[in-house]
Amino acid sequence: MANTLEQLKLYTTIVADTGDIEAIKRYQPEDATTNPSLILKAAQIPEYESLIDNAIDWAKSQSDDLAQQLDDASDKLAVNIGVEILKLVPGRISTEVDARLSFDKEQSIAKAHKLVRLYKEAGVDKSRILIKLASTWEGICAAKELEKEGINCNLTLLFSFAQARACAEAGAYLISPFVGRILDWYKKDTGKDYDAVNDPGVVSVTEIYNYYKQHGFNTVVMGASFRNIGEIIELAGCDRLTIGPSLLEELANSQVDITPKLVAATSTVAAEAPLTEAQFRWDFNQDPMAVDKLAEGIRNFAIDQGKLEVMLTAKLAN
């Protein structure tokens, strides 16, 4: 009998949620995703020292201004790690726009253009990149413009149906609803435990998946941020699932029978008129979990970006 991971791959595209090249070699995912926290973690792996040195040297060659060097080194490091990962996966790498730009559409677009340019200079076509943006109104609007340019986007930190609907209406290539972080909020709020079937994160992704398929949206649903393999098993059949190394290992060592739980609708109905900004903000604001977790997610990514910059600043000073 095939292990649980191999069975899951029959129904769902598996993505590695890591910057760790050894983990990617081990589990052979289709794609990989990174974020500021994962880049920070990867930057502390000894094997990546040369990638950091390259980013520092390149940044110094671009400008004499320390702030600009820091910005350049950070972007170049994320791209260097992405380029290494793309040597191992047949699909795409997701690279994230600085979380501090989450409420600035124009700066998010500019950062996306820069990342795409850096990948191109490294020999990587934009068809192998997903630009990650927070699912704020501004991030969604940035994605809408980038998609028109042929730059595909991964809308992340997604916790609500309002965000998911707006992303699809904007023509985003892919969304990353955060299953485990939704569960975290409800466990803390209610003091209850949830089995996988009733897990609020699983329920949310199932609702989004069904809505997309019923209304003919092409936006890919990629469940993210898992707390246990039960959540993953309940989302078998989802377009994609991005999974961290520890849970990939648990799936590989498990022998649970997998059946698809999410099945695309065979017929579609017309979608409603797109949400206006006012409607989006109101609907999103009505979901206290989503409001809390989006704000927290942006703050935490910004904190880890800051930690990475402290490390890079020390190296730039040498």
From Swiss-Prot:
It is an enzyme of class 2 (transferase). Pathway: Carbohydrate degradation; pentose phosphate pathway; D-glyceraldehyde 3-phosphate and beta-D-fructose 6-phosphate from D-ribose 5-phosphate and D-xylulose 5-phosphate (non-oxidative stage): step 2/3. GO terms for molecular function: transaldolase activity. It is found in: Cytoplasm. Transmembrane segments: none annotated. The active site is at 132 (schiff-base intermediate with substrate). GO terms for cellular component: cytosol. The keyword Cytoplasm applies. The keyword RNA-binding does not apply. One of its GO terms (biological process) is carbohydrate metabolic process. Homodimer. Transaldolase is important for the balance of metabolites in the pentose-phosphate pathway. Belongs to the transaldolase family. Type 1 subfamily. This is Transaldolase. It comes from Shewanella baltica (strain OS185). The lineage of its organism: Bacteria, Pseudomonadati, Pseudomonadota, Gammaproteobacteria, Alteromonadales. The gene is tal.
